């Protein structure tokens, strides 16, 4: 993973210490640059352009969503950070509507191409900090997977808080991140730390803890909160409005 990060770190703003001039918080600039080509977009979504890997990981995420928050045929579902439509492709056939949200117009273009055969999908470009374009109480499920690692902690909470506004009463939320408390998460943390500060790209992944996710869900006013660690890697937070 970090071999890839080191190799392509200069794509955003040039080589050397110029990388540090683009802050992590400039999500739109960062992710628009990273998704200039569809191949690049897929690489940053999953680490490679392999379509079989893309489909397999989407299937795994679908199982995780089904077992945690449940997916119903009558659900209106929204994804925060939909990327190239990896998960949307397996969700759209089994829900009423699927809305893909992303900070990058390029990502949304590729996602629309991937999901072009479905009439129940739409796409929304975000600022990178909230869900303002989405109507209040318009969704039954809001989820975000493999996205929080790229966000600062304040913006993780922003999305969790605004997702509650977007959800209907009884609506379900799912979020995840790599957990610092796991073996995989600690190695991930150490590999990131080993990159010299001046060379750390703004999209570098950062971890969470179960306590962090639980605090966010509680502070945002959710109920039926469940936080778990799975596969010695991921922390998952689920809750109900």
Regions found by a protein language model. Name each.
Residues 141-155:
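A short SAM/SAH-binding and catalytic strip from SAM-dependent methyltransferases
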Residues 79:
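Class I SAM-dependent methyltransferase core
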Residues 133-142:
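A short acidic, Gly/Pro-enriched loop at the edge of an enzyme's catalytic core
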Residues 1-69, 73, 84-133, 151-158, ...:
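Class I (Rossmann-like) S-adenosyl-L-methionine-dependent methyltransferase catalytic domain
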């Amino acid at each position: 993973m970090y071999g890839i990060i080191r190799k392509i770190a200069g794509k955003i703003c040039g080589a050397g210490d110029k990388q540090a001039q683009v802050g992590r918080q400039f999500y739109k600039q960062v992710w628009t640059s990273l998704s200039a080509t569809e191949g690049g977009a897929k690489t940053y979504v999953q680490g490679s352009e392999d379509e079989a890997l893309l489909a397999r990981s989407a299937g795994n995420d679908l199982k995780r969503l089904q077992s945690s928050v449940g997916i119903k045929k009558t659900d209106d579902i929204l994804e925060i950070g939909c990327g190239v439509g990896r998960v949307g492709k397996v969700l759209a056939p089994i829900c009423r509507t699927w809305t893909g949200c992303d900070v990058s117009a390029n990502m949304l273009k590729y996602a629309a191409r991937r999901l072009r055969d479905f009439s129940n999908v739409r796409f929304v470009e975000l600022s990178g900090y909230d869900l303002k374009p989405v109507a209040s109480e318009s969704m039954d499920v809001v989820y975000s997977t493999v996205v929080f690692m790229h966000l600062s902690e304040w913006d993780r909470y922003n999305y969790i808080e605004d997702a509650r506004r977007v959800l209907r009463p009884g609506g379900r939320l799912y979020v995840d991140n790599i957990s610092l408390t796991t073996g995989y998460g600690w190695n991930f943390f150490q590999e990131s730390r080993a990159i010299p500060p001046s060379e750390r790209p703004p999209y570098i992944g950062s971890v969470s803890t179960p306590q962090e996710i639980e605090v966010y869900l509680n502070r945002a006013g959710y109920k039926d909160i469940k936080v778990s660690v799975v596969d010695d890697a991921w922390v998952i937070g689920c809750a109900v409005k």
